[in-house]
Amino acid sequence: MNKYPIIVSLLLSAGYWCSPVSAAEACRADNTSVAARYEVTNRPPDSERLFRSKAVDHKIAEIKSQLTNAKLAWMFENCFPNTIDTTVHYRKGEDGKNDTFVYTGDIHAMWLRDSGAQVWPYVQLANEDKALKDMLEGVIRRQLKCIILDPYANAFNDGPTGGEWMSDMTDMIPDVHERKWEIDSLCYPIRLAYEYWKVTGDSSIFDDEWLTAMDKILATFREQQRYD
């Protein structure tokens, strides 16, 4: 059976078969609409962004100027700043030190692993923007506080607010959002702190609170090495 007529018929019915002239015109029109689409940003309005960084904005402009693919440039412009635009809550803590609570996507809780990964791309820019550096320090300090509070928890609330998992069969406290122990929850804060120190040379994060958190981490790792 000759399938060629069937294929042609299907192409015609689907609108895929057209003259060279109409195809060229369609391509030009499509390219125009695509270019227009990529000129529109999906970032929140400036007044609604949770945190602003001149260094991040400068990096976006730099990378966009080097990209010839409009879609890639548009994706970078919208994706790279998304964490600071929509999830970072920076303030001064009760001790006067930097404190940053980072939402994990649309969940109003902070995962130790996820928050470390979310802000990781910005560490390279820390020396170019003091506000950004302070925000990153705040993430590290908040992670240390969380670990000291409960090294077996993987996600925390922004204060003792409780949550939907309070009835889980484990030792839940109102500050904890979720208590599902993961080894990477304790590794990612160390990774972030080390990279921050390598880039900035700021050793102020390695204070008594750091030592207490490290003791908690080591004790937890040793406990989880048990055989029974």
What positions do the PLM features span?
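Short, solvent-exposed loop/turn segments at the edges of secondary structure
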Residues: 17-20, 184
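Positively charged n-region of N-terminal signal peptides that target proteins for export
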Residues: 1-4
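Cleavable N-terminal signal peptides
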Residues: 9, 21-24
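Polar helix-capping/helix-linker motif
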Residues: 13, 53, 69, 129, ...
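Low-complexity, Ser/Thr/Pro/Gly-enriched N-terminal "stalk/linker" regions
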Residues: 25-113
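Feature targets compositionally biased, intrinsically disordered low-complexity regions
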Residues: 13-14, 104, 200
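Aromatic-rich carbohydrate-recognition surfaces in CAZymes
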Residues: 108-136, 140-228
